From Swiss-Prot:
Bilayer topology annotation: Multi-pass membrane protein
Gene: MT-CYB
Name under which the protein is recorded: Cytochrome b
Cofactor binding note from Swiss-Prot or TrEMBL: Binds 2 heme b groups non-covalently.
Other noteworthy facts: Heme 1 (or BL or b562) is low-potential and absorbs at about 562 nm, and heme 2 (or BH or b566) is high-potential and absorbs at about 566 nm.
Cofactor: heme b
Family (UniProt): Belongs to the cytochrome b family.
Annotated organism of origin: Madoqua guentheri
Transmembrane segments: 33-53, 77-98, 113-133, 178-198, 226-246, 288-308, 320-340, 347-367
Length: 379
């Protein structure tokens, strides 16, 4: 008798995606982050659902409803901090996942990669709107500053900003719609993740060498299910260490002050995972130029498929490209540090140099290094 998992219409889909899926035998722990992102998304949806049961999206009561969750709701504090720090874990996994894709040339899977870039944008939008919901000082001023960037768009900018605000400033209408979008977007992200997997399973996974693995593949279960469970346990352990020992480590103290439109905080900055993009935005004196650089800093990921000049897919056997990749990682860490610093000397010039280096590395140095690598191998 044929196994039900191979014949049942629903079980068959799960079987082909997670059980009998042929996977390369040599994929390393860098391939764990896809499943970890799935774990993070489920965790965020569940904790978010329980928070939404007690949260009120109204300027008068939003801040006190978050306080109520932490003080009066059974285990409300742990749900709240798991959700807040879960977002940080989500972005750590996202950056690792994207970094692995860049290093091993996964961007040559065009559809999978571009759906991934859309997923990154959707996740960033969700995180930004979620940060606005507690209605603390940094929530309010962060929402004001970031939405105001759209006013840099010629002709329609001001109208667009007021349309998003639902008035002439960030107020009740803005908070209500941000809550609505913050609630619906994770489900859209989940649907996009399925599309992402669908395209991935059309081609099969990439491997560290970047060459076809058709000759040497193993079933996904039990080998990679066990590996993914280990990764998930380590992720949850790391998250719980953060939640139980230093829940406010990655947050901003200003967000424990209720939002006040009449009092601007001395340093307005987003959450740590947006600081690299914020530093690029701030390093350009022109408003429209800054906004374009901000968008391009993420959108540039889609260009990798066009500017890949190497005859090899992975960086595994390309030492010059490897060196440039790690310089890029160091540059992004520098930008993250600069984004959290005040706008004064020497941070301004460091930010500008790091921003120039970021775009130069991706658009000029990496393609040149790949061409040099080809010539050295006489290809």
């Amino acid at each position: 008798m044929t196994n039900i998992r191979k014949t049942h219409p629903l079980m068959k889909i799960v079987n082909n995606a997670f059980i009998d899926l042929p996977a390369p035998s040599n994929i390393s722990s860098w391939w764990n982050f896809g499943s970890l992102l799935g774990v993070c998304l489920i965790l965020q949806i569940l904790t978010g659902l329980f928070l939404a049961m007690h949260y009120t999206a109204d300027t008068a009561t939003a801040f006190s409803s978050v306080t109520h969750i932490c003080r009066d709701v059974n285990y409300g504090w742990i749900i709240r901090y798991m959700h807040a720090n879960g977002a940080s874990m989500f972005f750590i996994c996202l950056f690792m996942h994207v970094g692995r894709g860049l290093y091993y040339g996964s961007y040559t899977f065009l559809e999978t990669w571009n759906v991934g870039v859309i997923l990154l944008f959707a996740t960033m939008a969700t995180a930004f709107m979620g940060y606005c919901l507690p209605w603390g000082q940094m929530s309010f001023w962060g929402a004001t500053v970031i939405t105001n960037l759209l006013s840099a768009i010629p002709y329609i900018g001001t109208n667009l900003v007021e349309w998003i605000w639902g008035g002439f400033s960030v107020d009740k209408a803005t908070l209500t719609r941000f809550f609505a979008f913050h609630f619906i977007l994770p489900f859209i992200i989940a649907a996009l993740a399925m599309v992402h997997l669908l395209f991935l399973h059309e081609t099969g996974s990439n491997s560290p060498t970047g060459i076809s693995s058709d000759a040497d593949e193993i079933p996904f279960r039990p080998y990679y299910t066990i590996k993914d469970i280990l990764g998930a346990l380590l992720l949850i352990m790391g998250l719980m260490l953060l939640v139980l020992f230093s829940p406010d480590l990655l947050g901003d103290p200003d967000n424990y002050t209720p939002a006040n439109p009449l009092n601007t905080p001395p340093h307005i900055k987003p959450e740590w995972y947006f600081l690299f993009a914020y530093a690029i935005l701030r390093s350009i004196p022109n408003k429209l130029g800054g906004v374009l650089a901000l968008v391009l800093s993420i959108l540039i990921l889609s260009l990798h498929t066009l500017i890949h000049t190497s005859k090899q897919r992975s960086m595994m056997f390309r030492p010059i490209s490897q060196c440039l990749f790690w310089i890029l990682v160091a540059d992004l860490l520098t930008l993250t540090w600069i984004g959290g610093q005040p706008v004064e000397h020497p941070y301004i010039i460091i930010g500008q140099l790091a921003s120039i280096l970021y775009f130069t590395l991706i658009l000029v140095l990496m393609p040149v290094a790949s061409t040099i690598g080809n010539n050295l191998l006489k290809w």
